[in-house]
Amino acid sequence: DCVRVFVSDGNLVLEFVQPERGRKSRSFDMKDVKLSAVVRMPELTYLRLSGASKLTTGDEFAAGARFDGALSGASSARGLSVSAGRGELRLSGASSADLKARFDEAFLMQLSGASNASVDVRSDDVRMTCSGASNVKVGVRDAGHTGVRLSGASQATVSGETVDLKVECSGAARSDATALTAQHASVSCSGAGSADVEVTGELSVVATGGSSVVYGGDAAIVSQSVGRGASLRKR
């Protein structure tokens, strides 16, 4: 009687109902209760986790045109596998997620706080924005464009292959794309930010403050602006 399960506007809701005082049949402390549920569904288009909730999934979910996920607090999602036209994943607080996905058109990921994620994604357009002390590891496949925007003390490690790569680092952020082969790349670093890229074609660089940019491969630098105190070097 203390757990309600119902559907609201197409959403499955599992809810604790606070026991009434004085009823012997409900004389337990809700703080000692752990809610666990096994749910089987053919599609997963929207996911929201908060608090200390945890999600573990099995098979791949089809999400149709769009998948939207949001995690906050100390929540976590494990084994999440999704396919859709477009996808977006937002993590904040100390939340964490591991995701394997196929998004035919585009995938956007936003991390803040102390959140962390491990992602393997196949998509034409992959973009990630990280702030705070967040950390992300991303493997990209069949990417036409990959965008990495970092600030604060955030970190990103990116691997795979992409046609175009755009990296922006500020603060004490660090981008490691040594395992990502890019045909063309644009890198902009400021503050104490750092970026390391692997490029086979054209590379443009802007580095200011005490930032550093390192590159490998057969990159041909087509434009560079390196300020006093900043550095640009070949690996």
Regions of interest found by a model, annotated:
Residues 1-72, 76-92, 96-112, 118-129, ...:
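Acidic (Asp/Glu) and glycine-rich low-complexity loops/linkers
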